[in-house]
Regions:
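Cytosolic covalent-transfer regions centered on His/Cys nucleophiles
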Residues: 1-154
Length: 154
């Protein structure tokens, strides 16, 4: 059974038109936003995210990035999504700036969870139709519903 995005992303963790000048400022801002929900300090969150980014950018191309890391002491998987205005350089694989960022924080002990979460988010964000709509929506509720909608079975 594939992981659903709504199992780790709540409507209150959708942020539209976040403005940060660069990747490090952006990750720090997202860590500050996530910290109260997960019971970790923003410093701990950003340190692990930066360690992961040093292994290779989590910018997957097409203006989308999925920064993620695993944390000891985290009780359950957590997601946060931000649409950026303006887009920032994320050293993505296609060298295009990023304007849709999906932050994933995963418990260290949850072996397969983070791969399932990454797969769920990448499948959804790979749809050009979905990402184009996410770039234009002004209502957080509709943004959340589009992001968490289960793809139709054919």
């Amino acid at each position: 059974m594939p992981t659903s995005i709504s199992s780790f992303l709540s409507p209150s963790d959708v942020f539209l038109d976040v403005g940060e000048p660069d990747k490090i400022s952006l990750l720090s801002d997202l860590a500050r936003r996530a910290a109260p929900s997960v019971g970790l300090s923003s410093d701990v969150i950003v340190t692990e995210l930066m360690k992961r980014e040093r292994l290779g950018s989590t910018g997957m191309g097409g203006g989308v990035a999925i920064p993620h890391a695993r944390y000891t002491g985290l009780k359950k998987p957590f997601g946060l999504v931000a649409r950026l205005k303006p887009a920032v350089d994320f050293e993505a694989i296609d060298n295009m700036p990023v304007d849709l960022v999906f932050l994933l924080l995963v418990p260290a002990a949850a072996e397969g969870d983070h791969l399932n979460m990454l797969a769920a988010v990448s499948r959804r964000m790979r749809s050009r139709e979905v990402t184009q709509k996410l770039r234009t929506l002004q209502d957080k509720t509709i943004f959340y519903k589009l992001l968490t909608a289960e793809p139709e079975k054919h």
